Amino acid sequence: VCRAVKPDVTIMVDNCYGEFVETVEPSDVGADMIVGSLIKNPGGGLAPIGGYIAGTQKCVDRCAYRLSAPGLGQEVGANLGLMPSLYQGFFLAPNVVSGAVKGAVFTAAVYESLGFRVVPAASEERHDIIQCVELKSPEGMLAFCKGIQSAAPVDSYVDPVPGDMPGYDSQVIMAAGAFVQGSSIELSADGPIRPPYAVYYQGGLTWYHAKLGVLLSLQKMLDAGLVTLP
């Protein structure tokens, strides 16, 4: 559609959360450049920092020249000894992402069966690892996030509480007991405390860990009297 209007337009796609979910990437279907974060899908849980740029030679070169200087591009710059972790994480990423997608589908199936609205539905096609569950109340969000946090390998004893965050006009609750701060390929959940009280669940370095997190979120909902099992 874009090129029908302007054939020479440059198309860039922010592919965060979408890498390795489908059999093709945006660059396979016409995007000139795709960008994303290495502490999300493509880092496989091992990359401690960083991002990536991929695409046409022209786009990549222009980005590199902007980062350093024209003519120098990718030939200069520190890698801080991180390259083995980045390469290994990238190698493992497709398998890690498949576990996260299974976890998202499982989450949708569980909460859908209990009468909650989920987006996407368990049977719908997926384009990223994020699963939205509308929990109907602040108490539901709190219980869900406590369950996710209790499954964490780091800070599992912590109880998430809502707090103020820049850019939001309501408080936000977050559960993220991760090895890498901010990593959303690791098991995590968050959302603003406002109607429809939707929590956004994502990640899990393994399918089994994702499943544990979902089951513990359900247990916390049960303990709080917010859900009844059939």
Show where each model-derived region lies.
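PLP-dependent enzyme catalytic core of the Aspartate aminotransferase-like
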Residues: 170-230
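Short, structured secondary-structure boundary patches
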Residues: 34, 53-59, 135-144, 178-181
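Conserved PLP-enzyme active-site core in the AAT-like
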Residues: 1-98, 102, 111, 117-119, ...
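Conserved small-domain helix->loop->beta segment predominantly found in fold-type I
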Residues: 81-95, 108-175
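Short, basic, helix/turn surface patches
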Residues: 61-70, 145-153, 183-193
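Structural motif
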Residues: 9-11, 32-33, 51-52, 130, ...
